[in-house]
């Protein structure tokens, strides 16, 4: 995809994202896949097919995904326990949605250890995954992007911590090593465009900022070109469907659509409730 086409891609997705959110609010969250309108040069037909049709397994490196859902390799015997004692036990975390993913993250952490790995996290919440990376990779730096306003779902379900979410994040990260964390407050679509302007590059990208398909697709598309070849891209909530089957209200269909767009440029590292990829070519 050329530079002009890439710019068209971003502009069109941002415009469609604003339109969709307006319509979602008007119809109280009831959406339809007919609202997808993408530029023809963006392989819109393939994206629509991926969103509307039955999910196909992503393309896989044969040695890496022998079955429908990968079984993570063993982690050091007390890695999770030490993290809970040394970090979670001294922080303020109202929810633990992360430590169950440590076994699938560990092979990627091993690949990054011993170097100054650059990590981008889209969606930080209270900083639990941020803290894990800082704790697990003492030489890594983390750029964490979040509005720190909480999602509509978190507000509706009263899942936000008492006090300022941003202050909770700051305190938790400071306990590990706040000097290696860069906090960027704002909508990820705008913030990641600013990172493009800085010519930033990352070795690991974690996309966990929204459950809306268009948000997920835009976050993935914008961060892909920031990811180094052989770097890792991890999507959270691959199978999440708590609000029903509508493809625009779930991350999974957007992730599958993104995989169609970058077909041939990645291999799957692990697949379960999260999907982890390794970028093989630009």
Language model features by range: what are they?
Residues 2-282:
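A short alpha-helical cap/connector motif
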């Amino acid at each position: 995809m050329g530079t002009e086409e890439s710019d068209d891609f971003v502009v069109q997705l941002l415009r469609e994202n604003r339109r969709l959110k307006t319509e979602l609010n008007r119809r109280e969250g009831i959406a339809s896949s007919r609202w997808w309108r993408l530029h023809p040069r963006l392989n819109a037909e393939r994206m629509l097919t991926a969103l509307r049709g039955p999910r196909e397994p992503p393309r896989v490196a044969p040695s890496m995904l022998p079955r429908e859902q990968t079984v993570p390799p063993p982690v050091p015997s007390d890695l999770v326990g030490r993290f809970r004692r040394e970090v979670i036990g001294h922080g303020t975390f109202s929810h633990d949605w992360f430590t169950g993913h440590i076994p699938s993250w560990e092979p990627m952490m091993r690949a990054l250890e011993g170097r100054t790995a650059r990590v981008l996290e889209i969606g930080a919440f209270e900083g639990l995954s941020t803290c894990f990376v800082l704790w697990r990779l003492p030489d890594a730096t983390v750029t964490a992007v979040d509005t720190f306003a909480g999602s509509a779902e978190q507000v509706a379900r009263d899942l936000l911590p008492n006090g300022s979410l941003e202050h909770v994040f700051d305190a938790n990260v400071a306990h590990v090593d706040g000097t290696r964390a860069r906090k960027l407050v704002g909508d990820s679509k705008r913030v990641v465009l600013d990172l493009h302007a800085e010519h930033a590059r990352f070795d690991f990208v974690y996309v966990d900022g929204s459950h809306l398909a268009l948000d997920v697709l835009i976050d993935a598309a914008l961060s892909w070109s920031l990811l180094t070849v052989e770097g890792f891209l991890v999507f959270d909530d691959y199978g999440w469907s708590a609000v029903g089957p509508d493809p625009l209200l779930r991350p999974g269909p957007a992730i599958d659509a993104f995989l169609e767009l970058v077909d041939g440029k990645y291999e799957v590292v692990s697949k379960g409730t999260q999907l982890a990829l390794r970028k093989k070519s630009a």
